[in-house]
Amino acid sequence: MKPFWKTKNFQIRWKEPLGKPDCPYAFRYVLILFGYSIRIHVWIRSDDKRYLHDHAWNFRTFVLKGHYFNVSQNNDIIVREKVSFTAFRKADHRHYVEVPKQGCITLLFCSRPYRKWGFWVDGKQFKRPLKYFHKFGHPICSEQ
């Protein structure tokens, strides 16, 4: 999706659907200033649960409405952490977001991107998003 407004050091993205166009799992609102970003995510359902993903930047998230579960892995143990107020995540934190039926709204303050992000297939193989979705497709809407 093209930005609503964009210059070299400034960008606005408004109501970007995340996931499949016919059933997005969230809508994203983004303000980017000199590489730093402020994002609002309106979560409708969970993101892709098949494999964990990481991010390009560190971020602090604040829950504005509802709550979500941050699902990550510590060695071979799956860790499901309820986030109802705030959490800080490093870019290399591997996780997926599990959202209850009532949805959730979050506010994120993000550092400048400093690495590539992607999915970790079987916890080992790094796949960039386009290659990941090309190989595995998007999850079925009812399975999110």
Regions found by a protein language model. Give the residues of each.
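A short, N-terminal "cap"/entry segment at the start of jelly-roll beta-barrel domains
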Residues: M1-S37, I77
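Internal intein/HINT superfamily modules and their associated LAGLIDADG
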Residues: K20, T86-A87, K124-P129
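Conserved short histidine dyad/triad with adjacent acidic residue
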Residues: S37-D54, K90-D92
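A short secondary-structure junction signal
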Residues: H41, S72-N74, E98-V99, K116-D122
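Short, conserved beta-strand element in jelly-roll/cupin
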Residues: D54-F69
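Short acidic-glycine-tyrosine-enriched beta hairpin
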Residues: V71-Y96
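Ligand-binding loop in jelly-roll beta-barrel domains
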Residues: K90-K116
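Active-site or metal-binding loop neighborhoods of secreted/extracellular toxin and effector enzymes
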Residues: W117-Q144
